[in-house]
Regions:
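N-terminal cap/lid segment of alpha/beta-hydrolase-fold proteins
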Residues: 1-32
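Short beta-strand element of the alpha/beta-hydrolase
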Residues: 33-42
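Serine-hydrolase catalytic-loop signature spanning alpha/beta hydrolases and amidase-signature enzymes
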Residues: 44-52, 71
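Conserved alpha/beta-hydrolase
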Residues: 57-84
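Low-complexity, serine/threonine/proline-enriched polar segments
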Residues: 89-128
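Conserved acidic catalytic loop of the alpha/beta-hydrolase fold
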Residues: 125-162
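Gly/Ala-rich beta-loop-alpha elbow adjacent to hydrolase catalytic centers
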Residues: 164-170
Length: 171
């Protein structure tokens, strides 16, 4: 576990360290691939979302570790274990249950949701997914800039890598 990026801010009496990126490293017993995988979560999530699925199945991190990849789980700055500071990063947002259910519930608003069977309403897996959501910065542009700066530092440290993203973390 380590942190990359970030900066000191504030005045001489009250300095803060902010905008750093929390990173966990998982190395398989036998590495089979030259490039590690950096996994970067989407909005409202943390690196924990790569470790296990809401219904208890193996997460992507364990899958790739089992296949011989070194895996870096990174948390976007100002989110989760990459501390957020209100005086530096401003207000945060949080997904509402209604906004998340639009992806999973058959409410008639999205035609494709009628075919959805993975998250039947009230299912424990959906509750686990909803419970895993955290606050995030309201501006994707601000989030992207912070990830760009800290991600650059991570790549300087580890070298070339495969970047695996989810949702808001994508290109």
């Amino acid at each position: 576990i380590f942190y990359v990026g970030g900066k000191k801010t504030g005045n001489e009496q009250d300095q803060y360290y902010c905008n750093q990126m929390y990173v966990e490293v998982y190395t398989p017993q036998k590495k089979k691939h030259p490039y590690p995988i950096i996994m970067l979560h989407g909005a409202g999530q943390t690196a924990v979302n790569w470790l296990i699925t809401p219904d208890g199945r193996m997460g992507w991190a364990d899958y790739f570790i089992a296949h011989g990849y070194e895996v870096y789980l990174a948390e976007q700055p100002a989110r989760g274990r990459s501390a957020w500071h209100p005086e530096v990063n401003g207000k945060t947002m949080h997904h509402t249950i209604v906004s998340l259910e639009r992806f999973t519930s058959n409410q008639g608003k999205w035609p494709q949701s009628k075919k959805h069977t993975q998250w039947p309403e009230g299912e424990e897996a959906l509750e686990q997914f909803l419970s895993s959501q955290v606050e995030y910065l309201p501006s994707n542009r601000d989030s992207q800039q912070l990830v760009l700066e800290a991600g650059r530092e991570l790549l300087k440290l580890i070298g070339p890598a495969i970047l695996m993203t989810h949702s808001q973390a994508g290109p």
